[in-house]
Each structure stands twice: as structure tokens, then as C-alpha cells.
From Swiss-Prot:
Gene3D superfamilies: Uncharacterised protein family UPF0058 (1.20.1270.110). It comes from the Archaea. Belongs to the UPF0058 family. InterPro entries: UPF0058, UPF0058_sf. This is UPF0058 protein AF_0738.
């Protein structure tokens, strides 16, 4: 992958992280990522650093899914509120 594609993937996973945090679901799952200090806006960072950040984001997201079923996450009122505010079409029956 090119660096631009890596950064786009990093940004996508970062947005998922923020979604979980805003819903109150992430409880320390992204501590290692936060400590790394590499965010998608840090375009001057190396491709390797962005790959490490992606790996840590994936780890945090997978830990959330390991602890909670997708059904539990979907039924979470906090997450539902966040999803409705950013993508209401996903919540329509």
C-alpha cells in the first residue's frame, strides 16, 4: 500500500475509535494507541509508524468485539445515539 492509503485506513480506524469512545464503550482499549502518539493528521510520520498505529487500533477494536457481541453493541443506547447522529440511514428499520 502507498503511504496515502495507509493514512486513509488509519483515519478510518481512528474514526471507529472515536465512535466507540463517544458512545462510552471504549474503556482503556486504546491506551497503547494513545501512548504511541501517532494520529492520522501526522502525515510527516513514517509509513511504519502509521502501520503500528493501525495495528494498535485494530487490537483495541477487536478487544471490544471480544468482550461484547455485535448485537450488544448495536443495542447499546449510547452507540445507537452516536450512529443516528452521524449516519441515520443505518438505524432505519
Amino acid at each position: 500500500m502507498h503511504k496515502e492509503e495507509i493514512i486513509l485506513l488509519h483515519l478510518t480506524l481512528y474514526n471507529i475509535k472515536k465512535l466507540f469512545e463517544n458512545a462510552g464503550i471504549a474503556n482503556g482499549h486504546f491506551k497503547a494507541y494513545d501512548e504511541l502518539g501517532v494520529q492520522p493528521v501526522h502525515i510527516h510520520k513514517s509509513k511504519t509508524e502509521h502501520k503500528k498505529a493501525i495495528s494498535l487500533l485494530c487490537k483495541g477494536i477487536s478487544e471490544i468485539f471480544r468482550e461484547r457481541s455485535p448485537e450488544d453493541l448495536i443495542e447499546s443506547e449510547n452507540l445507537k445515539f452516536v450512529i443516528e447522529s452521524i449516519a441515520p440511514e443505518l438505524c432505519e428499520p
